[in-house]
Amino acid sequence: MAEGKKYQINISVNTAYLAEQSDPSADRYVFAYTITIENVGTVAAQLISRHWVITDADDVVQEVKGLGVVGEQPLLRPGETFEYSSGAALATPVGTMQGSYQMVAEDGNKFDAEIPRFTLAMPRVLH
């Protein structure tokens, strides 16, 4: 069996601009994002840590690393999903996030689940 199929995690993202928590006059733009992590591989895997790269429109980069997500290190058996919501604050109305989750499969193999780049944007800023 191909390694790629054995250890395969799909990640999808939904984002929202939080106007009530943002203050554009103070260069504070707050976004929520909901991540769905799905194990489409053939072995169970546990999310151990995360690594985010957050870039605003001025190319200011923040890197965030830490254990788990929202205080959890979920174990995903084949076919299972885990969903969580979190947020990010930027100094510009548009930015991007991308990164990876560090996973450990039940057989002890360690691998990264890549989080594809996604856009955070205040409504009516992007055309």
UniProtKB/Swiss-Prot annotation:
Record-level GO BP terms: error-free translesion synthesis
Matches recorded under PROSITE patterns: APAG
SUPFAM superfamilies: ApaG-like
Pfam family, one: DUF525
Domain annotation ApaG: ranges: 3-127
InterPro entries, alphabetized: ApaG_domain, ApaG_sf, Uncharacterised_ApaG
Protein name in UniProt: Protein ApaG
